[in-house]
Every structure is written in C-alpha cells, then in structure tokens.
A protein has these predicted regions:
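N-terminal secretory signal peptides
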Residues: 1-17, 28
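Cleavable N-terminal signal peptides
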Residues: 24-25, 35
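A generic secondary-structure boundary signal that marks alpha-helix termini
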Residues: 27-28, 179
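N-terminal signal peptide c-region/cleavage motif recognized by signal peptidases
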Residues: 31-32
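Structured, non-membrane catalytic/scaffold regions adjacent to prosthetic-group chemistry
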Residues: 38-408
Length: 408
C-alpha cells in the first residue's frame, strides 16, 4: 500500500538543486579533496564521495610495497596479491646499472648480422607490425633467499612477477630483415649503462619471443625497459633484455660478460653449466607465512606455482613436514609459463608442524629438495635454486620460515 505525501513534497534534491549545491560548494572551496574523500567514514551515505581523479589510487587500507635491495633490485609482495597478475607498480626490478631513461622519439633498434637487410627500427615502426598479447611470468635466475626464520614470501622469492605483455613477435622482425637459415644465435643488447648483453639460441625461443612495448594495458614502465624490451617466456629474466637497442644474428654464441662471469652455474665436479636459460618448476606458500599467527581449526593454505617448461600440472601440499602429500586445488585458468594460484583446505590440530608445497609441471619435472640440488650442483652456485620451501608453525600459532629445510 503506497503512502500519500504532502503536495509539493519531493524525495531528496532535484537535479537543478543538486547542481546549485555542487557549484556553490565548489565556489566556496568546500568540496572534499581526493585525500579527504578516501578517509574511511562511519556512514558513507552521509557525505560526498571522492570526485573523479586523473589517476586512480589504491584504498588507503591497502598498502602493498616492493622491498628494496639497493642498488640493484626490488621484490614483489607476493603475500599481498590476489589472482595471478602483478600490478605494474609492484613488478619486481632487477638492474645492473640503474634505470636507463630513453626518449621514445629518439629510440632506435638496430637488427643486423646474418640478415639480408640490416634495418634500424623506430618505436613507431615496431608498433606498426601486428601486435600480440600474452600473459607470462618473469623471474630472476637468482630468485632465492632463505637464511632467517623471520623471512616473508616476498623475501624468499619475490624476484618473480606476472604481467600481460603486448608487443610484436620476434619472428616478425626476423622475417622483415631476412634472417639467414644458418643464423642460430642472436645477441640482445640493452641501452643501460651496463650495456647488458646476452646470447640467445634462436630455435629455442623464436616461437614465443616478443619485443614488448606495453604491460597491463599501458606503455612499459621505465624500470621494465621502456620503450621496448625483449620478452622470452619461461627464460631467466636477465635474458629478456630491457631498453633493447641492438640485435645481431650469428651462427654461434657471443660469450659476453653476462654469460661467462655471471649467469653460468659452476658445478660440484669443477665444470660449469652454461646457457641454463629455462626456469624450472617452483612453488611458494604465501599464506600462512611469516609474520602471521594462526589459530587452531580451519586454515586455507594458499600460494602460487610456475614453470618455465610449460603448464603447472599439480601442486602438492604436506602438512607434516614432507612425510605425506596431498593435491591442492589449482585456480583456473592455468596458463603455460605463467603463475598458477593454488589453495588447500586444512584443519590444524594445534600441534607444532611444518607446511610445505611442491610443484609438478607438464613434463613431469618435480620441484626438488635443496639437498637434491646441492648433490647435483654443489654449493658454488646461487642461480636457478628452486628448492621446496615451507613454514614452521609453533603451538601458539606463530609462523616462521622453515630455514632448516634449505640449510643443506
């Protein structure tokens, strides 16, 4: 039954009255600014909300930050993220000589060597080619730290991030210059002060390699190689050379500084593993993790897994320190050479224990224990360490990094 209202009564403000109120408030300088509007209000229906901004911002209640490791890197806050995409401003950084600031109008990319037509491309030239977009992770080959119990997932392996990348296929560029059939390697050279250079085997990467000029729908950020970087899905991050300025095709590797004094794995028998480009399967539990404290009862174990070999097929969870394993649930979609999110429902009985995860990829590769890695490679390498990691849980619910598991 509809109640009657007095003649002339209207609910709220008319459009004209609302406009007068808004303009009057603006003239008096009493409109709430963006900072004020973002302050939590007991009743958001009783005050004006924030007006549109030229640039969006996070809620003040959310404060994810990269951890800084000056002067060369910063780490992604894995424990603070949802889904599988990393916001551009939280993507990890790794530099050899700081950021290169490149004028896009002056940008040039030289492609030469074993080609029919050596060419120099501008940024506009590159953007004229058919564009492709794909989602994949990047990971530094030195992405492991685990010497203290008071260590977060961000510190353990925060040198990995995942982005939607847009650019042109490397195969398109090589076709444009007429790459010779005998060309089996190419040199990628950056425009930073270190003149970062890597030799890349063409056959192994050509099907997926890109020249990327955008990430997550916007131009590359300077720390990610603006205006153009090489992108090699599944390959150690340093080979995806940023601020790309030159590619030279050859029939042999170039043996640069970065693949002799660095990024080569010395082995226990005195030999070395060179051009170990692919990042093997890995996982990390992001919650519960240090510095959390949990309570007895239901706990959801969450984390991410990835493999440079392709798809993550499964993630296994142990809640008894690795004695028994059970399958976690993978959040769909699971993409090749991409972070996959997993979860596992657990009833904690309140007794001290250790929770552990391990990934298995589509090739059957199983993420190894640190003892197996040390047995195969010795102790002189810090690259490509992807050991099984976990978290100890004390009787009072305090969570700490299981440092003894990786102290081999």
């Amino acid at each position: 039954m509809r109640k009657t209202r007095p003649a002339g009564h209207r609910d709220g403000l008319t459009r004209r009255a609302l406009l007068r109120t808004t303009l009057g408030a603006a003239a008096l300088g009493v409109m709430p600014d963006a900072t004020q509007a973002q302050e939590p209000s007991p009743d958001t229906t009783k005050r004006w909300g924030r007006l549109p901004n030229a640039l969006g911002a996070r809620s003040p209640a959310e404060n994810p930050r990269r951890t800084l490791n000056p002067p060369t890197s910063s780490r992604t806050p894995l424990q603070d993220l949802q889904g599988t995409l990393t916001p551009s401003d939280l993507h990890y950084e790794r530099h050899h000589s700081g950021l290169a600031v490149v004028d896009p109008r002056a940008y040039r990319l030289l492609v030469h060597g074993m080609v029919d037509r050596p060419l120099t491309f501008t940024l506009d030239d590159i953007k004229r080619f058919p564009a492709v977009t794909r989602t994949c992770f990047l990971e530094c080959s030195g992405n492991f730290f685990g010497t203290r119990e008071e260590t977060t997932p961000q510190d353990v392996c925060g040198l990995t991030s995942q982005t939607e990348w847009t650019g042109v296929m490397l195969s398109t560029i090589f076709s444009e210059v007429g790459a010779h059939a005998g060309a089996t390697w190419f040199l990628a050279e950056g425009q930073d002060a270190a003149v970062m250079t890597r030799s890349i085997p063409i056959k192994e990467v050509l099907g997926e390699a890109m020249l990327a000029y955008a990430q997550n729908g916007e131009a590359l950020r300077p720390e990610q190689g603006y205006p153009v970087r090489l992108l090699l899905p599944g390959v150690e991050g340093n080979a995806s050379v940023k601020w790309l300025r030159r590619m030279k095709l050859s029939d042999r590797p170039f043996m640069t500084r970065e693949e002799t004094s660095k990024y080569t794995d010395p082995l226990a028998d005195g030999t070395a593993r060179q051009f170990s480009l692919v990042m093997d399967a890995r996982s990390v539990i992001t919650s519960p993790a240090y510095p959390e404290t949990i309570e007895k009862g239901f706990v959801e174990i969450r984390g991410i897994a990835w493999s440079g070999r392709g798809l993550v097929r499964r993630v296994e969870i142990s809640t008894d320190g690795g004695r028994t394993w059970k399958a976690a649930t993978l959040q769909q979609p699971v993409l090749p050479k991409a972070h996959a999110r997993f979860r596992y429902a657990w009833q904690w009985d309140g007794r001290p224990t250790e929770i552990v995860s391990r990934a298995v990829d589509e090739t059957g590769y199983v993420q190894p224990e640190m003892s197996a890695l040390r047995s195969a490679r010795g102790r002189r390498t810090r690259y490509h360490l992807n050991p099984v990691t976990g978290w100890t849980i004390a009787a009072d619910g305090r969570v700490r990094f299981a440092v003894e598991r990786v102290r081999v």
